[in-house]
A protein has these predicted regions:
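Catalytic core of bacterial c-di-GMP phosphodiesterases, primarily the EAL and HD-GYP domains
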Residues: 87, 127-136, 161-239, 315
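Structural preference for long, well-ordered alpha-helical segments in enzyme cores
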Residues: 26, 30, 34, 68-75, ...
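Active-site core of bacterial EAL-family cyclic-dinucleotide phosphodiesterase domains
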Residues: 89, 100-157, 195, 256, ...
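Short hydrophobic/aromatic beta-strand micro-patches
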Residues: 13-16, 54, 138-140, 195, ...
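Cyclic-dinucleotide signaling modules
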Residues: 1-102, 106
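EAL-family c-di-GMP phosphodiesterase catalytic domain
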Residues: 14, 127, 144-145, 197-204, ...
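C-di-GMP signaling machinery
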Residues: 58, 74, 78-120, 128, ...
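Flexible loop/coil segments at beta-strand boundaries within sensory signal-transduction domains
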Residues: 41-43, 126-129, 144-146, 185, ...
C-alpha cells in the first residue's frame, strides 16, 4: 500500500490486490477515522473526506497512469457531489460526466467574463408587520442558449473549482450597488443579505474586501448583512472568530445561515457575536403539524432570543407556517409563500398579504 500527496488537500492511495469489496471496506475505515474529532491545543476540530475509487484492470479503456488518475478524479467528483464523508466508484458513465463538468467550468468562466450572471432578490418580511425589512441576494446564470440557470446547477462546480470566490465578490458588489440605489429612491430598506462561501470566508481578507466594496458603492455598513454557515466557521474556529470580530467592527450585520444543519455548537455560537440565526427550510417545511420540526423551531427561536439574536425562518410557503412562526415570536420570514426572488427592478414593495400581525396570531397554533 502506497500513499502519496498529489497537492493541496488531495492524496492518492495505491493498493495492490484490492477488489471492490476490500476497497469499499478500506474507504469506510478511512472515512470513519477522519470523521472523529481531533484536538490542537484546547480546540476540538472536525474534518471530513470524499474518496474516489478506480479499479484496474477494469475498465479496459485505461491505457496509462494518466488515464487512471483522471478516472479516479471523476470518481472523486462524484463522491463530493453525493455529500460529505462518502465514496464513489468510477464507471464509464462518469467519463461523460467529467467531460460535461469541464464544459460547464469553461462556460462558467465565460459567464463571469461576459456578464451573464444576474442577481434576483427575495424579500425578507417582518412577520409582525408584514412589511419588507430586507432582501437576500441570490445569483442566477442567464445562459445565452439555455436561459436562466438556477444556482443549484452551477454553484457546486464553482465551489469545487474555486470560481465561487469571484462569484461571491461580484454578488457583493452588485448587491451593495442595488441597495444603495433603492435607498436613494426612498425605499425603506433595512438590509441586503449576501451569502458568503466557505472559500471566501476562509481567505482571511473578507473584511478588507467588504470595506472596499462598501466604500465604492457608498452603502452604509449597517445595511449589509453577511450570511455565513457553521461549516465555514468550524474549518478554523479561532481564525473565524477573529474575522467575525473584524467584520462586526465594520458595522455590518452577521447571520448564521442554515442553523442546526451542520456541527452546531452552543459554545461556539456564544462566542460568534452574530446578530441573527436563520432557521433552515428543512425545519420549516413540516410546520405546524410535524411535532419534531415544531419542537426544534421553538427551541431555536427561544435560544436565539435568550442570546439577544433575531431569527429568520426560510422556506415559508403557507399561511399556517407563518402563523405558527409568529406565534413563537419569530422575527422575520422569507419564502415562496411571500414572494419569489425577482430582479431588482421588478420588486413589489407592498406589505405581504400571506399572514401578519393580528391575522397571524388569531390562527396561530
Amino acid at each position: 500500500m502506497t500513499l502519496g500527496r498529489l497537492g493541496g488537500d488531495e492524496f492518492a492511495l495505491l493498493c495492490e490486490g484490492y477488489g471492490a469489496e476490500k476497497a469499499t471496506a478500506l474507504a469506510l475505515r478511512i472515512l470513519d477515522r477522519l470523521n472523529e474529532p481531533f484536538h490542537i491545543g484546547d480546540q476540538e476540530l472536525f474534518s471530513s473526506a470524499s474518496i474516489g475509487i478506480v479499479l484496474y484492470p477494469y475498465p479496459t479503456d485505461v491505457q496509462n497512469a494518466e488515464q487512471l488518475m483522471r478516472n479516479a478524479d471523476s470518481a472523486l467528483f462524484k463522491a463530493k457531489s453525493n455529500g460529505r464523508s462518502t465514496y464513489a466508484f468510477y464507471s464509464e458513465e462518469l467519463t461523460s460526466q467529467a467531460r460535461q463538468r469541464v464544459e460547464l467550468v469553461t462556460a462558467l468562466r465565460q459567464a463571469l467574463e461576459q456578464g451573464q450572471l444576474r442577481l434576483h432578490y427575495q424579500p425578507i418580511y417582518d412577520l409582525r408587520q408584514g412589511t419588507i425589512s430586507g432582501f437576500e441576494a441570490l445569483v442566477r446564470w442567464q445562459h445565452p442558449e439555455k436561459g436562466l440557470i438556477a444556482p443549484g446547477a452551477f454553484i457546486p462546480i464553482a465551489e469545487e473549482t474555486g470560481l465561487i470566490s469571484a462569484i461571491d465578490h461580484w454578488v457583493l458588489e452588485q448587491a451593495c450597488n442595488q441597495a444603495r440605489e433603492w435607498l436613494g429612491q426612498g425605499h425603506p430598506l433595512g438590509f441586503i443579505a449576501v451569502n458568503i462561501s466557505s472559500r471566501l470566508f476562509g481567505n482571511g481578507e473578507l473584511d478588507l474586501q467588504v470595506a472596499t466594496i462598501l466604500a465604492r458603492s457608498g452603502l452604509e455598513a449597517r445595511h449589509l448583512e453577511l450570511e455565513i454557515t457553521e461549516s465555514a466557521v468550524i474549518q478554523d474556529p479561532d481564525a473565524a472568530l477573529v474575522l467575525l470580530q473584524r467584520l462586526r467592527a465594520l458595522g455590518v450585520q452577521l447571520a448564521i445561515d442554515d442553523f442546526g444543519t451542520g456541527y452546531s455548537s452552543l459554545q461556539r455560537l456564544k462566542r460568534m457575536n452574530v446578530h441573527k440565526l436563520k432557521i433552515d427550510q428543512g425545519f420549516v417545511r413540516g410546520l405546524p403539524d410535524d411535532r419534531d420540526d415544531a419542537a426544534i423551531t421553538r427551541s431555536v427561536i427561544g435560544l436565539a432570543h435568550n442570546l439577544g439574536l433575531k431569527v429568520v425562518a426560510e422556506g415559508i410557503e403557507t399561511a399556517e407556517q407563518a402563523a405558527f412562526l409568529l406565534a413563537q415570536n419569530c422575527d422575520y420570514g422569507q419564502g415562496y409563500g411571500f414572494a419569489r426572488p425577482q430582479p431588482g427592478d421588478a420588486i413589489d414593495w407592498s406589505p405581504s398579504e400571506l399572514c401578519h400581525g393580528q391575522a397571524c396570531r388569531s390562527s396561530g397554533r
